[in-house]
Amino acid sequence: ERVEAAGRDAEALCEALAALEEDFTRITDTASQRAKDSGTAPNRSLVHSDTRRSATARIGGTVLDAMAPLDPLMTSAAWLMGRLGARVEQRAVEVYEKLSAASGEERVNLADFWFASMPILHGGAVTDAQEVLAEFQRRWARIIPLPEGEARVRASHSAVASQVAEAFPPVPVAWSAARYLSPDVLIAARDTGAIGRGDFELVLGELHLASNTMGASLFVSQHPEPAELLRLTGRDHPGPRLLPLLPKEHKARLSTRVRNVLVRPEDYYVALMELTADPHRDRTVLSADAHVVRRDGRPVVVLPGGAEFPVTDVFGHVLTTLAMDMFQLFPDADHVPRVMVDKLVVSRESWRFTGGELGFA
């Protein structure tokens, strides 16, 4: 309360922060700030301040129409996630069969299954991601060839869309978060007037896979209508979800600012390693109380109340971590040209070199 009351008064804010840290250390006998390392979340102090710009940007139909080439990109991204999920699920089947054979039981305890899957999630699944991406890029190379020495390559949305539909057929959603795609799109124009005249280009910065950026705590907490975001989440997921609880520390260096908070009362949490949810929250399940069985040849998780979910949902965070930055249309090379589909730059021009190749180095 004292920190909040200090507002923009720098001197009062420093005093309030110092007092808070002193109280925390006295009560917990723990340092109020943590040292930065590979396993420490970005936010290492007790409190932080988030702000929202007062400016509001609105875009019209002209800009939205120019975003149409995102559609075939997203179609191919869905294929990419589906293939990755299918590969990991097949590895999960092998783990299940091994544990089931060893115990002589059709039901395998989820806690045992999770720990037996560790070599897959941090080994085989990484290889799967690399191989699936390589195939993804081979298919895109046939859709948009990159002539050697060219600085600019152009293609039309209609031509690309028809080829993408053939090269990347629909696949089932592999895990619940794989419904989401979060593109970062920049507008390149001299000024707002130029945009109105249609004199602009769009640039795809990144296309994040299996992640709803708007679900991050820092966005939800500052959104004018968080309830609306939860309502829309219900449209994306008409039924309950099974969400793995994240450990207190994670090598991905997650923080309270970016954790997904669009979680509804009907969603289930499963504690795989640490129980980091509200201990009084309903629908929080310990992995030791759940089981893995096969349904129509596919592994599913059965919760104590009888609810069932694809086993890939248990791996959801690991799969999202693998997939989030996978989207790359063309492999790295000494030179990759700028590739445009209509008004959208889908791949920016890039160069790769070593220091020894540079005359001034």
Label for each model-derived stretch:
Residues E1-D236:
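Type-3 copper protein
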Residues G124-A125, E135-A361:
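Acidic, serine/proline-rich low-complexity intrinsically disordered regions
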